[in-house]
Each structure stands twice: as C-alpha cells, then as structure tokens.
C-alpha cells in the first residue's frame, strides 16, 4: 500500500466519522423533543425534525448537517497532505456515507441531502447554489421536501460538469454522481410514495406557529 493510498483511507475514516454525527437526533433530545427516530418518518434529518413542530430546531439540523459535509471537504482541501481533487472527492463521498450509515445508530441514518449539498458548496459553489435553488423551489411549490431533494440531485451531476468545466470522468463530477445516486437510493420509499401520490406534505406553516 502506497503512502497516498494510506492517506485516502485515513481521510475516508475521518470524513465518515464527521458525517456520522447525528445532529438531528442530538438536538431534538437536548431540546426535550424525545427520540426523533420515534417521530414521524423516523429519519434523523431536518425534514423529520420539522415534523416535531420546532422550525428553529429543524433549521439548526439542516445547517449543521450541511456544515459537516463542507467541513470534511475543507479538511481534505486545506489540511490533508497531498491535497487534490481526488482527496476532496473521497472526503465528499465518505462524509455522505457517514451521514446515511452512522455506526453509532446501527447504520440507520439520514438520507444525505443537506450533507450532500454541503459538500457540493465547497466542491463548486455555483453548483451548490443552483442545487439549493432547485431544492427550495420544488419543495416550496409541491410542499414535498423529497421532491425538491430528488430534483436537485437529479440535476447535480450535469450541473457540476457544465458549471465547473470538469469532464464527467474526473474525480469531482464522479463524486457528485455517486452522492446523487446514493441520495436517490436512500429515497426509494419516497419515490414509491410519490408515484402513488401518498408522499406526505410538510406543513411548514403549521410548524412555524408552534
């Protein structure tokens, strides 16, 4: 094993651990909201935290989940020996895997949307901005958060190629594609409900009044 390969393994582990911090679970518990895994969909992400009726708590979860994605890529970019697009791509994928499959929760985590967006903001901020706009616009119009997330990550790989000028086969577009595929896979049950018209809508206005 080469030194660079060993560094990539270490970076993957560091990024995975960062991603596996379950902010939704921790914040809800500290705020006296109980175990978020026993509320709503049982997911630890911001959308399910919003179902507790605590809009500020959901916003904090969204922000912190995004920041851990950004942090992993920033570590790979500025603090890791031999920093390159490859190290940034590895960190981006590993931190999203950590969020989706945290060892502390029996590998049952979130769906990776906020963390994925956090990585993309650092990899190429115009793509991150475009994905956020798509997500928020579709979610606002449909009142279905999963629809916004799926739309954003359907477009993310193509946007990365177009806006960053990188060929599809290079590390950062490949990482964006892998993250998008993982997020779509994590939304398989949502997709099934969207097809049948049974996907629940997020009652943002009701939540904001609590």
Swiss-Prot record:
Q: Identify this protein by name.
A: Glycerol-3-phosphate acyltransferase
Top-rank EC class of the record's enzyme: transferase
Signal peptide position in this chain?
none
The record, for InterPro entries, names: G3P_acylTferase_PlsY
What organism is this sequence from? Gluconobacter oxydans (strain 621H)
Q: Name one GO biological process term.
A: phospholipid biosynthetic process
Q: Which domain of life is it from?
A: Bacteria
Q: Name one GO cellular component term.
A: plasma membrane
Stated role? Catalyzes the transfer of an acyl group from acyl-phosphate (acyl-PO(4)) to glycerol-3-phosphate (G3P) to form lysophosphatidic acid (LPA). This enzyme utilizes acyl-phosphate as fatty acyl donor, but not acyl-CoA or acyl-ACP.
Q: How does it assemble?
A: Probably interacts with PlsX.
Pfam families referenced in this protein's UniProt entry, alphabetically:
G3P_acyltransf
Compartments it resides in: Cell inner membrane
């Amino acid at each position: 094993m080469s030194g660079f390969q060993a560094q990539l393994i270490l970076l993957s582990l560091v990024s995975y651990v960062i991603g596996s911090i379950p902010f939704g679970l921790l914040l809800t518990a500290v705020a006296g909201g109980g175990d978020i895994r026993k509320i709503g969909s049982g997911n630890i992400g911001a959308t399910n935290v919003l179902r507790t009726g605590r809009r500020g708590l959901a916003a904090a979860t969204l922000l912190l989940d995004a920041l851990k994605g950004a942090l992993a890529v920033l570590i790979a970019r500025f603090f890791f020996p031999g920093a390159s697009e490859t190290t940034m791509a590895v960190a981006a994928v590993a931190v999203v895997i950590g969020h989706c499959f945290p060892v502390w929760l029996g590998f049952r985590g979130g769906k990776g949307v906020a963390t994925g967006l956090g990585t993309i903001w650092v990899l190429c901020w115009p793509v991150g901005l475009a994905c956020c706009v798509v997500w928020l616009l579709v979610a606002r119009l449909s009142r279905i958060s999963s629809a916004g997330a799926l739309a954003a990550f359907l477009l993310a790989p193509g946007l990365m190629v177009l806006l960053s000028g990188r060929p599809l086969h290079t590390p950062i577009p490949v990482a964006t594609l892998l993250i998008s595929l993982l997020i779509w896979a994590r939304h398989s049950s949502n997709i099934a409900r969207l097809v049948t018209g049974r996907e629940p809508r997020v009652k943002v206005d009701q939540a904001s009044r609590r």
